[in-house]
Amino acid sequence: YAPSAEHRATVDRAVRELMATQSADGYIGTYPDSCHLGDWDIWGRKYVLLGLLAYYDQTKETAALEAARRVADHLIAEAGPGSGTNIAATGWIGWKGLASCSVLEPIALLYQRTGEKRYLDFARHIVRSWDEPNRLAPAGLRLIQEAIGETAPWKMSGAPKAYEMMSCFEGLCELYRVTAEPLYLEAVQRLVDALVRDEIMIAGSGSVAEIWCHGAVRQSEPLYQGMETCVTATWMKLMYQMLRLTGDSRCADRLETSLYNALLGAMSPRGEWWAYYSGLMGERVHSHQQFPDVVMSCCVANGPRGLMITPSWAVMTTADGAAINLYGKMNSTVKTPSGQPLKINMESEYPVQGNVAATVNLPQSEAFALELRIPQWSKRTAIKINGEPYDGYILPGTYASIERTWNDNDKIEVELDMRARVVDAPSGVGDAAIVRGPIVLAFDSRLIPRRDGVTEPPMYRYEFMRDTDNYIDVQLVENPETPAIWMTFDVPCKDEAGNKHILRMCDYTSAGNTWQEGNIFRVWAQQPFDFRHLYTNNVDWRVNVTVGVGRPEIPDIYKK
């Protein structure tokens, strides 16, 4: 996404050095022979394969593909058909084979690139192993059966490790691409439905201490180690898979929610560090502070992966044309059905504002469908083509499919419904949050300081002023006093005597973004809320730091 000679040289060197570690039998990994298949060995091999295949896709360097073949062949010899080893019984005991079985994804990808049947056979063998009882899972993992049977995610497989479980289903998506086995796609869809219903929180992620936890219902509670960044990134990757396979615009809605909230909220302002966990209340804490013994954690690696898939889903090709999934200032180029380049130049301040203007550039006029995503929350959407109102269907949660002969320099205007909504907590406990467009709002101690009480009479308990449809008249603040905050809002509230007050809130990504002790934030607030308890005591860095008695210092990678 940012090609340069320096980046090319860095990647080339990394791949050369990685391949140089390959042993004579094909193994690339960090475990001695006596420890193969244990703990995170196959998980590490999975990422070696993904890296080699990604490099091959980018460069067509056959040495990388051959190295990937040798890694896979060595694994097949150790844990494939006829090896006597059930791959679902390998790996760290706590996660019952989920990590090892997620190697399904690169094995299916390797088959796609080589057409060599042994890789397809191994992929199918991995899926069959899920049904076999083993020493780690006496009833077997049963991932497909439990997904289709709508088992609650936090009960699935006896080890509801969120990141690794979704990774297995990513592999199932790739296997579906080469087999067209409908059961595979149905299983993934059922899992997605269950995660949306039971686990994914308002910011577009889930998990507590890395496992599914019925988080959709529990999200307004003070949760220990909430929303692992690996879960955020993998949820986004799974949604990207399902967007490609189904064309369901709600997948793009979820990608957008995760991008603008959970993912960017986990990234430090300079981008050099990521959080391991990011709650909906408390403080921002870098991964190195949360796990000082790890430093370069899985979350520091995965955060950028979630970020870097964004150009891939922002504008996509379809069977009949192209789809615009993400609005904002951008230039994109995709192919039309006839193969000519379709350039879309978009001007917009979205998601700060809801107006989008796009220009279509084509070498020659062509008839095709341009799909415009209508977010599920945008109940009032207006579209114009060359200044004329579009008279087709504009339905929230779908695409507006504009089929016409497109000409060079055609203009598209979209006006999205940016009215803020009050969302009641799914638990029914009386908490509420505010969402404007895709942006989740939060209280921040820089805007509403922690306090012991309110001195102004008559009351100190406030609640959001919503209308009968749960909309609230939130106003964007121009030129806010805290420039480090991306979006600042004036939010109308009323006290228990009925008097109106204006409180300041900000976007979730900016909330707590000094990443320092004492900068506290909160998304869900009890209705009505007491200022003395707006920021829950002891829900700060302590809920996200696993060792030590004080908040650790973060290393500055910019220091020489």
Model-derived regions: residue spans:
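C-terminal beta-rich recognition modules with glycine/proline-rich loops and embedded aromatic residues
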Residues: 123, 188, 253-261, 266-359, ...
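Long, well-ordered core segments of solenoidal/helical folds
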Residues: 10-27, 66-83, 121-141, 188-204, ...
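Short linear capping/connector segments at secondary-structure termini
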Residues: 30-36, 88-91, 147, 211-217
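Solenoidal tandem-repeat scaffolds enriched in leucines and small polar residues
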Residues: 79, 83-86, 90-143, 148-156
